[in-house]
Amino acid sequence: MARTLTALGESFPLATPFRISRGVKTAADVVTVTLSEGGVIGRGECVPYPRYGESVESSIIEIEAIREALESGIDRRVLIDMLPAGAARNAVDCALWDLELRLSGSDIATAMGLA
């Protein structure tokens, strides 16, 4: 079945600025990944950190670079070799977990042997 990918950047203003010693954050800049297959949707997200050389834009570029593989049906085990550890891989990994479990009718607790 055909799978489709959407990767979008979103910015959510914080009600109160978050202050720490190295700066102030006034919004949560998030990348949201949606994978859909056969009417079933899996979602994942990440918050890229400039401290680690990440941005919303760079994360989306990393995700778009593997669009063909994602849409052709790779699973999360293959993803580990396709993207380096970081925000982009986290968002895609979460979307793949969510999609896999929804397609199988299972849940994370059962998949992890906790239920």
Where are each of the predicted segments found?
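N-terminal capping/lid subdomain adjacent to the active-site entrance of alpha/beta enzymes
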Residues: 1-115
